[in-house]
């Protein structure tokens, strides 16, 4: 089950942090259709946010078809996001990326620098192996 981490100093509204974290968990395969999300009461107890904040996040995710609220039963994942990478591939990539982030910090980069560099690489790295041209997937970083 996902546990939400709310960063009050981030400047991002708490409900958007919940939405982002659910979307990330879906994209990374940590949540699957049928999985139950924490109850509003549990999220409030663990994070200290207002119940309406959690309800707003869950409602927004329900409106786009990612969650399903079942009366008296809770909130469940209705759909997933992301590609078809295996859990093993995701774990390997996560480990490699964590090493890269540690190296970037050791080189003196701050989190914002790392995010900017990653956006540039995502935008300018070709999806095919031919090494020419920017990312042509049609998505922005």
Regions found by a protein language model. Name each.
Residues 22, 58-59:
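Short, hydrophobic-biased segments on the C-terminal half of alpha helices
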Residues 1-36, 42, 91, 95, ...:
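Extreme N-terminal segment that seeds HTH/winged-HTH DNA-binding domains in transcriptional regulators
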């Amino acid at each position: 089950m996902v546990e939400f981490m709310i960063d009050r100093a981030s400047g991002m509204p708490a409900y958007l942090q919940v939405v982002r974290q659910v979307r990330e968990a879906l994209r990374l395969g940590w949540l699957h259709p049928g999985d139950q999300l924490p109850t509003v009461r549990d999220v409030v107890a663990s994070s200290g946010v207002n119940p309406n904040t959690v309800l707003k996040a869950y409602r927004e995710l329900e409106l786009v078809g990612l969650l399903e609220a079942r009366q008296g039963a809770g909130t469940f994942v209705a759909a997933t996001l992301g590609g078809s990478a295996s859990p093993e591939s995701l774990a390997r990539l996560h480990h490699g990326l964590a090493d890269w982030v540690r190296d970037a910090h050791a080189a003196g980069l701050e989190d914002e620098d790392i995010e900017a560099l990653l956006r540039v690489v995502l935008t300018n790295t070709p999806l095919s192996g031919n090494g020419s041209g920017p990312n042509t997937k049609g998505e922005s970083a």
